[in-house]
């Protein structure tokens, strides 16, 4: 079974991202706008219980933090992804690191660049046109993040929440 760990931002930020994603992101229907903390990994139902207990401990060790959108950016020329760049503040980076320990699987397929995808898999010409238009716009947004989510992938490719972990809370 495939799992991942992500932050879902506020409805306001999700609505903003979706206004672009429905036109420019082929994965629009598979998962809501999110900030990936840990990329897709495979696990058994039995092992995910152990992982869930570790995530609970991680969530208690971190306080809510500010998520700040800085601007529109891209991963070009590596791949055609347009995203809202998220400030890589200390709390967010530390949380990301805490989710990549030996117990949770250290492998990080990419350098952590906090972002919220708004377009991907676009042909080069369309990618450059869209990026040019969006670069002229201001994307400034701040909000408090107080939770992260363990997600799992359904057979049809969509992602759904398996469990939610509140930051700084002891339950």
Residue ranges and their predicted role:
Residues 79, 85-86:
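Charge-rich, low-complexity N-terminal segments
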Residues 1-66, 74, 88-142, 159-171:
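Basic, often amphipathic N-terminal segments
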Residues 70-78, 117, 147-158:
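Short proline/glycine- and acidic-rich turn/helix-capping motifs at secondary-structure junctions
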């Amino acid at each position: 079974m495939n799992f991942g760990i992500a932050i879902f931002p506020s409805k306001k930020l999700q609505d903003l991202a979706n206004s672009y994603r429905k036109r420019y992101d082929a994965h629009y229907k598979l998962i809501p706008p999110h900030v990936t903390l840990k990329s897709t990994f495979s696990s058994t139902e039995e092992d995910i219980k152990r992982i869930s207990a570790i995530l609970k401990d991680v969530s208690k060790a971190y306080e809510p933090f500010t998520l700040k959108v800085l601007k529109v950016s891209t991963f070009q020329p590596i791949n055609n992804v347009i995203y809202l760049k998220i400030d890589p503040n200390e709390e967010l980076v530390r949380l990301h690191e805490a989710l990549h320990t030996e117990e949770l699987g250290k492998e990080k397929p990419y350098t952590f660049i906090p972002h919220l995808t708004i377009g991907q898999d676009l042909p080069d010409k369309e990618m450059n046109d869209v990026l040019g238009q969006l670069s002229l716009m201001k994307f400034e947004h701040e909000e408090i993040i107080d939770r992260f989510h363990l997600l799992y992938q359904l057979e049809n490719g969509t992602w759904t929440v398996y469990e939610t972990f509140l930051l700084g809370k002891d339950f």
